[in-house]
Amino acid sequence: DVPNGVHKKRSVIMKYAEEGLQYHIAVKNGDVGKYVIMPGDPKRCKKIAAYFDDAKLIADNREYVTYTGYLDGVKVSVTSTGIGGPSASIALEELVKAGANTFIRIGTCGGMDIDVKGGDVVVATSAIRMEGTTKEYAPIEFPAVANLDVVNALVDSAKKLGFEYHAGVVECKDSFYGQHEPEKMPVNYELINKWNAWLKLGCLASEMESAALFFVGSYLRVKVG
């Protein structure tokens, strides 16, 4: 006998396949623009979409919310990723399958370098791979690097808008409290030593998605920054 839950899952998968929908983000080819903004928090999608012309809610499934509209006549979308590398990499892989090819990660981070003040913009050029998702794609020797075209565009925009900004390396982690309360962790010595090393190396900020997004972008040959 097959459990009822298995039958239900199979029926959902078949329905998505028949409609051409991606399994997690629930969008299909034509639903999204080539350019996608990727916040972590689903609630931020509606706020971002308010800047679009003719914005429409396309999908709302799990942590993945997608709106599509237009900016200066160009079709663009916003899709949330949830927290961390696993869910972010799923969103990116499925958005690429749906036809998108240029992505901007937007969200909050924790400042590390003393020059990074609250409210400053941090443009990540690359990420320290302290998370586990990218290890499923390639050995640790391969770097997680943002696309240069996207980085340059973000820096140019920050300059034009007069924002205080910093461009450089960020730390990407899996455990929020492992970094913010390291002394409570069984491996506190390792976490603290690495944190101090990153500071000495000029790491700008700490967050939880960039490494996975940069890495999957490199693998899929799309632009991510």
For the regions a protein language model found, what residue spans apply to each?
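A C-terminal functional module that forms or caps the active site or interfaces directly
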Residues: K194-G225
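Metabolite-binding pocket within alpha/beta catalytic cores that recognizes anionic/polar moieties
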Residues: K9-A153
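A residue-level signal for conserved active-site and pocket-lining positions in enzyme catalytic cores
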Residues: D41, V170, G217
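Active-site rim beta-loop-alpha module in soluble metabolic enzymes
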Residues: V145-K200
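Generic secondary-structure signature for well-ordered alpha-helical cores
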Residues: A50-L57, S126, V155-E164, S175, ...
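Glycine-rich beta-alpha junction loops
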Residues: G110, E171-Y177, A212, L220
